[in-house]
Amino acid sequence: MSKKFIELGDPVTQDEKDYEDYVGVGFAHQVPTMKRRKLTEHGNTTESKEDPEEPKSRDVFVSSQSSDESQEDSAENPEIAKEVSENCENLTETLKISNIESLDNVTERSEHTLDNHKSTEPMEEDVNNKSNIDVAINSDEDDELVLEENNKEMRDGEQVQQDLFADDQELIEYPGIMKDTTTQLDITDSEVETAQKMEMIEETEADSTFVGEDSKNQRQSGTTSDEVDADSQINLATKTVRTSSSSFLSTVSTCEAPAKGRARMYQKELEKHVIAFTEGNLTLQPDLNKVDPDRNYRYCTIPNFPASQGKLREDNRYGPKIVLPQRWREFDSRGRRRDSYFYFKRKLDGYLKCYKTTGYFMFVGLLHNMWEFDPDITYKLPALEMYYKEMSELVGREEVLEKFARVARIAKTAEDILPERIYRLVGDVESATLSHKQCAALVARMFFARPDSPFSFCRILSSDKSICVEKLKFLFTYFDKMSMDPPDGAVSFRLTKMDKDTFNEEWKDKKLRSLPEVEFFDEMLIEDTALCTQVDFANEHLGGGVLNHGSVQEEIRFLMCPEMMVGMLLCEKMKQLEAISIVGAYVFSSYTGYGHTLKWAELQPNHSRQNTNEFRDRFGRLRVETIAIDAILFKGSKLDCQTEQLNKANIIREMKKASIGFMSQGPKFTNIPIVTGWWGCGAFNGDKPLKFIIQVIAAGVADRPLHFCSFGEPELAAKCKKIIERMKQKDVTLGMLFSMINNTGLPHKHFEFYVFDRISTYLSSSEDVESSKSSPSVSRA
């Protein structure tokens, strides 16, 4: 009798607990539809021998003896041939696909077949004929559909993480996270539970007019010849930066930009940022030279830098949550042997010996084995099937099989290049720094994480939606790059937090400051920038729906930079006074579309500029920070949402959340901008004028300039600019502005610019302006 499919929340034995894969908070991954394939008289699938073999780049994860060499040796040596044959037979028998028909002739399909996908959802190769920004403006409906799907998954995921982290020990309260004891400043616990939900924020896709490297790319991107010529001239230009404080960069090579005006504009900004970093001798946090190594762990080797001296922690101090489970090791963190270790190791080794001759189903079999599925049942993986079919037509079957093998090779390196213990950012653990290769090993292991783990790619692979096929393109592109030409450097993940009393002191010191400098960019997108802090419109669970069907701002960023997914393994659900900082993530892909129209695209110059090696710091990290801050979800009519947002507790909560994120780098970054946009709007129904004002206050508290990307809403941006100019003319301080938005009153009917109108009323009356100088402190609000 076949055993049932693994169900979420099923009781597990102590032995199974030892083998748990990546665990923690996050989304539950529903199990794929369980179907048997129709049996036929045929044996294993046969593949055409006429496929031309493309020349391959060297794979850095391939052992000194390649699979080809192994197979050639086996032809000459009967003993080797017998061993390889046995390995192949064992793997194939486990899946029991000897009687399964060829992939090309599968007759039983899910409701959405590959052919249906091709006919109803074309690849939209000519999407650049319409501005990506226009697409994003009309994507609220897509956002809400995705949001509704993920709301249920988040609730299920919280239950899953409770099951996975079940432990007899009573966990000690984490030091360093001070709980609020009053409700004057913050939303009460019950309000937080109902107000803070997943974030699917509307942002535009990347600009469609990319500058191509040849005429073909130029035609696809819609870039004119004049723009290419202008960008080429700018690309040839370099600026010598002379500084006595640092030699980090002697020349700045300008990256291509997607449009002529943007290229020139951004070149000027980039030069300013370089000068600010060099003259200020700035180091993005964590500064590994100065931080406490017992709280800030470095797991990689950095040239000319001492080995990390972080202390070894006891599991029982914080419970099992503190150590990231490593299912691929022979022993767990408590020294207990994993009986399944050799089984999984043999499966990976066996697959890599015969993947070229056994085809697509061998990779499916490997996944089934690693997921511990019933060997008598074949589970459908529609997205993987569609990816295999589509890419085989484009690059050839052999290359697609090689892509699968690269994932397995990188996953195998985890045991060798990762430390025995990786501490999650709980308790007093503040940060973790890993190399690009270590990040790749962790992400590759997510392919083989069991479906009951919140951090498994099983949900993507088993989906029948075309968006998941696009996600696989992002992921396999990442592993291709990491196999062929991996970047050399490191990435830091840090939990930044502040207790209530400390924040109140910060506010008292800074509420008399003038408003910060604010610049508006109608065309530039957040991901077009470098040498700055980029805002991630985050979910309280980092990564949002990237492992499901989510495909808006945060998910797109994580697909462009898959290393960010490591943060999902390390971080728990964000609390009210927390933000998550990621420093040094590399960009591997570009994109077009947004939401359900998202498409993978080759890496373009406007996105690759932050990968410039000259921008790396002494620890090997790229000088760019992504700061994840989650906003409140508002529900109801437009009037209900607007009224609820003007509640003082909600204004204070959003201002604190943004301020803590913007202050993540400390007081020295006064010339390094924060690049943001309509945070908390879109599917979260945020009031755009109010969210803009809140971010202005937060940037002022952090004493940093604000670069605001309006995402194709120039009229609204013009109103934002006008109100800022008026307030500066009136010498409005941060405290005065905070007082204004806290005393706007409630609207009788919805009006988009209600907040701006109320501020204008204050500014028009000198008496009101003077009276607002006696601004109440945040602690009394």
UniProtKB/Swiss-Prot annotation:
Keywords: DNA damage, Hydrolase, Nucleus. Coiled coil: none annotated. It catalyses: [(1''->2')-ADP-alpha-D-ribose](n) + H2O = [(1''->2')-ADP-alpha-D-ribose](n-1) + ADP-D-ribose. It comes from the Eukaryota. The keyword Hydrolase applies. One of its GO terms (cellular component) is nucleus. GO terms for molecular function: poly(ADP-ribose) glycohydrolase activity. The lineage of its organism: Eukaryota, Metazoa, Ecdysozoa, Nematoda, Chromadorea. GO terms for biological process: ATP generation from poly-ADP-D-ribose; carbohydrate metabolic process; DNA damage response; nucleotide-sugar metabolic process; regulation of DNA repair; response to gamma radiation. It is found in: Nucleus. The keyword Transcription does not apply. PANTHER family: POLY ADP-RIBOSE GLYCOHYDROLASE, POLY(ADP-RIBOSE) GLYCOHYDROLASE. Changing residue 594 to A: Reduced poly(ADP-ribose) glycohydrolase activity in vitro. Belongs to the poly(ADP-ribose) glycohydrolase family. Poly(ADP-ribose) synthesized after DNA damage is only present transiently and is rapidly degraded by poly(ADP-ribose) glycohydrolase. Poly(ADP-ribose) metabolism may be required for maintenance of the normal function of neuronal cells. Residues 28-87, 102-131, 206-232 are annotated as: Disordered. This is Poly(ADP-ribose) glycohydrolase 1. Expressed in head and tail neurons. Also detected in the central nerve cord and motor neurons. Disruption phenotype: RNAi-mediated knockdown results in increased sensitivity to gamma irradiation.
